[in-house]
């Protein structure tokens, strides 16, 4: 029997190598991989982000465009596989569709609570309007009260560094 965690790690490594070796085709390749096994969308996105952080947001957004129902899996996979890149990816997702903000932020921070600061910084960079950012923080608090403090702390740190 195949261990699903080992299989996910292996698929992530393949996606990472692909993103590093063929960055211009990384999104298209990741979508093809995801279409053949949607259950591994997070592993694919996380691996691609770890393999080439410069294309992480583009790859993730292309994957979301191909199957919007997997947006939370993709955000969680990036937070798990490449936490430093999670902010840019989740920020791009929120900027593209503010209606998914609470879900993707919650998915990313649930997958890897240590990514909360990066996620908050990415969201703040993508949503510079203070009122909108406060609204997103309220949605995050409602969706995941345990993660709300870490997210708010990450936003505060991001504001200090602006």
Task: List the predicted regions and their residue ranges.
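Fold-core signature of tandem repeat domains
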Residues: 10, 14-19, 26-34, 41-49, ...
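Conserved small/polar residues in nucleotide/adenosyl-binding loops
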Residues: 1, 160-162
């Amino acid at each position: 029997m195949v261990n699903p965690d080992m299989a996910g790690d292996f698929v992530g490594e393949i996606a990472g190598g692909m993103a590093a070796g063929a960055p211009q085709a990384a999104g298209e390749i990741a979508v093809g991989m995801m279409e053949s096994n949607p259950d591994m969308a997070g592993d694919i996105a996380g691996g691609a982000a770890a393999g080439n952080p410069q294309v992480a947001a583009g790859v993730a957004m292309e994957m979301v465009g191909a199957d919007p129902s997997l947006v939370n899996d993709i955000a969680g996979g990036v937070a798990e596989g490449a936490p430093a890149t999670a902010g840019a990816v989740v920020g791009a997702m929120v900027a593209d569709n503010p209606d998914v903000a609470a879900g993707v932020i919650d998915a990313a921070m649930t997958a890897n609570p240590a990514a909360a600061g990066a996620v908050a910084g990415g969201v703040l960079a993508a949503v510079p309007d203070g009122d909108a950012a406060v609204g997103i923080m309220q949605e995050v608090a409602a969706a995941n009260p345990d993660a709300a403090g870490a997210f708010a702390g990450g936003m505060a740190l991001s504001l200090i560094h602006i």
